[in-house]
């Protein structure tokens, strides 16, 4: 097939991957002028859609930003803070200032104080090598906190261009669409622009002083659980409502299964509470450690679901990660799934996740 390009952004048209760059429905190829799905949504509905990107593509974009004099706005999913992190961002974007914005704040328990969460984000960012000029919490879906971020962008950009970066599924496009609505009402002000030095298109939103805000394509972090489930199950892993913590008083040698996606063994220590922050729709099953392997072997895909029976053949094996908990209130985090808060110190636990999914400890978020 001869190469067809989108008349909106110049990207090469493809009809296979709906989430990929340059996707257009096969039927559209019969038209004289072909427009990709991303530009179509942009033009007709004033909506920005995320597209998938390879690591190399994404690094090219970040290096390109490093060669500009601009403000960078980094969006993370506060429910999956570490899983939606972009490593090395500070180095890659050069000396440009960075605003850190935690999205989906509305799904965390309302009892969590906003100020405490922002301080936690600052500490975590520092440990991960990022020194943001400011930190914000928003709910892009509900429009909460957006005006505050707009004011900060105006303050810090000083007439410069603004680049919004983030992984897929962090709500980056929803965030930008909220900004557009807040600033301009319903006007169709978006144009598309080739990103300097790459073949990838960034979305350009002209600002009133001659500079622009750019939406850059998102990157998939392969260590997140979302990478290993189908679209139906992905909805379960993307909570829309406030998380309801579930507490289990466990004796040692007891196990929790989170559907069939992950497992938590309390290996040794005194009887203690373990608080699970997982999507509300995800069933949690308790069993004895000595029965845990047999339970999974017999019931994975049925009692222990998601994934369903049909997906089990392709679902990666669960890999063990053992931790000795030395501090009170420590989180065991399953990247892209949730976390278990270990309330007391001096515990030995083992966490199982699909091969490739990151599991790690951190100081308690809540």
Swiss-Prot record:
<keyword id="KW-0547">Nucleotide-binding</keyword>
<dbReference type="Pfam" id="PF01926">
    <property type="entry name" value="MMR_HSR1"/>
</dbReference>
<dbReference type="InterPro" id="IPR027417">
    <property type="entry name" value="P-loop_NTPase"/>
</dbReference>
<dbReference type="GO" id="GO:0032297">
    <property type="term" value="P:negative regulation of DNA-templated DNA replication initiation"/>
</dbReference>
<comment type="similarity">
    <text>Belongs to the TRAFAC class YlqF/YawG GTPase family.</text>
</comment>
<dbReference type="InterPro" id="IPR050896">
    <property type="entry name" value="Mito_lipid_metab_GTPase"/>
</dbReference>
<feature type="domain" description="CP-type G">
    <location>
        <begin position="59"/>
        <end position="222"/>
    </location>
</feature>
<dbReference type="InterPro" id="IPR019988">
    <property type="entry name" value="GTP-bd_ribosome_bgen_YqeH"/>
</dbReference>
<dbReference type="InterPro" id="IPR048422">
    <property type="entry name" value="NOA1/YqeH-like_C"/>
</dbReference>
<comment type="function">
    <text>Binds GTP and GDP.</text>
</comment>
<dbReference type="GO" id="GO:0005525">
    <property type="term" value="F:GTP binding"/>
</dbReference>
<dbReference type="Pfam" id="PF21516">
    <property type="entry name" value="YqeH-like_C"/>
</dbReference>
<dbReference type="InterPro" id="IPR030378">
    <property type="entry name" value="G_CP_dom"/>
</dbReference>
<protein>
    <recommendedName>
        <fullName>Uncharacterized protein YqeH</fullName>
    </recommendedName>
</protein>
<dbReference type="InterPro" id="IPR006073">
    <property type="entry name" value="GTP-bd"/>
</dbReference>
<keyword id="KW-0342">GTP-binding</keyword>
